């Protein structure tokens, strides 16, 4: 027995943002002849299920999301083809933040991404309080009016000390004083560009390693002081040398102030940050008065001011002592929070000796001057899928890595560079500081236990699987010893790079 069934096709068309059709829509009617016997219908259903499963297996999609809101969609349907992605424009999605935060975000949507990232903290508006934007919008014109007054005051001060007093007429004297004020303020303005650059471009660095950046601030400030010192030799190049020196000192100030605020916050364990800052001013002003007194005694020494080599030698000697004292003052700081440098120390100690050092010992072993990028083993965080796939852009390698790290919030792979091993880490959406610790533990275990050389991709994957197994067995012990050693696990300076994140929810297996 047969019957005729009429189905309007297509039954379902998934609509995507990237696929459109220029053909006019037609309603097709498909006539199918089917048997009324249940067994035949089941066979047709099974065939349809097989085709549907085949499509799902064939079309695997991975979404790579970027910090500026854009994303790239990868189709992993052909193991033999190179990895390719489709870049998608930014989509504005509503979130669950407060109404004030949503209003703040709406007010800045017209700003280009580069300007937004330069002006506002990372994660704005969710990373700051709701009144942040309103305060800054009022603070900005306040600072403008303050600097206008500063220019007028500078001009008056220069007139008072006699600048332009020998120019003849009153009009000429006024013009000379104004020109001198413009040159002096221009010097300050050029220097202010350094603070603008540091605050906008490197603002996210200070919370992680305030010791290092406070030390670098003194190095750069020393270079700026040297340019100021050189104006005595080349007075005709005063504006160039003074502006360069002021620029360097402004960069140093841009590094110094945020770093020291982090250090002050570390001191204020009772929530008394304002009092700690005020008492620090007492220490600083007292030191300033003593230093000014000794400085006046030195320059008042007969014959010293006229001898530039002696001035240079004296300045160099005192500056070296100053840098040594600065290093010693930073070396005694004892942070009980985990940053990337300290995380490397405690992870290596646990992998090699099964011991986690306390924060006092770890801070003593921390290298203040060394950048993380120069530490061994070399670990590159926040890489893209294309970088993970290697030079060959292998789809099969990416699929194997995604499957291996299904339970993790990151993907770690490695490359052999001569005698050194380089690790690359890509984080997934919703990764936390705990995942940063896990990838560090895995990298150090591989560095310690992996054989000197490996021949092919299969051996690399073998070691990766082995390291994941070891980490599953020992990471809980690491966290327990970290807690018992006195480390603050509630607060962490291990930040997940948000420039590139993998959306695991779009990965079908």
Curated annotation (Swiss-Prot):
This is Protein root UVB sensitive 5. PANTHER family: PROTEIN ROOT UVB SENSITIVE 5, RUS1 FAMILY PROTEIN C16ORF58. Residues 22-49 are annotated as: Disordered. It comes from the Eukaryota. Belongs to the RUS1 family. It comes from Arabidopsis thaliana (Mouse-ear cress). InterPro entries: RUS_fam (IPR006968), UVB_sens_C (IPR055412), UVB_sens_RUS_dom (IPR054549). The gene is RUS5.
